[in-house]
């Protein structure tokens, strides 16, 4: 069996610290000689204070027709709130036994989708995953395509 070659750009050691703030300069440091074809954000959108820098950076780093897939808590069912339309933060437990609650950021579906559209993405896939109750989705998974402006 042939040994896989390691991409030195991807294999170099990185130290990440995260405080809920996305720094566009740090994200753009991921830029390489050619644009990326795909980008994935798995269960991070709800942990970020302002997601606009994330979406803008991903858009800039992707090639035309590149794919951005992201998953996040379902804003309609996970964060049952009287303030669905108002972006806000709240604290909750992610994993039983964790030492303290963590901060989450709630956004409505229209806020998330409109940010995609305003950034230049077209949504061509939307999925709702159910884990605990087969009729109440916990997660949304969005597939967005970068359209040349």
Regions picked out by a protein language model, each given a short descriptive name:
Residues 119-121, 129, 134-149:
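Core SAM-dependent methyltransferase catalytic element
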Residues 52-67:
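A short glycine-rich, Lys/Arg-flanked "PGG" loop and its adjoining helix->strand segment in the class I
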């Amino acid at each position: 069996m042939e040994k896989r070659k390691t991409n030195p750009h991807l294999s170099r050691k990185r130290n990440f610290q995260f405080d809920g703030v996305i720094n566009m300069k740090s994200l753009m440091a991921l830029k390489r000689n050619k644009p990326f074809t795909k980008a994935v954000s798995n269960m991070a959108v709800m942990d970020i204070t302002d997601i606009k820098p994330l979406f803008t950076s991903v858009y800039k780093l992707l090639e035309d027709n590149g794919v951005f897939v992201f998953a996040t808590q379902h804003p309609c069912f996970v964060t049952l709130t009287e303030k669905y339309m108002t972006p806000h933060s709240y604290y909750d437990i992610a994993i039983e036994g964790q030492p303290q609650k963590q901060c989450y950021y709630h956004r409505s579906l229209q806020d998330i989708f409109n940010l995609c559209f305003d950034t230049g993405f077209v949504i061509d896939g939307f999925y709702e995953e159910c884990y605990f109750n087969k009729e109440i989705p916990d997660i949304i998974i969005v597939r967005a395509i970068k359209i040349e402006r």
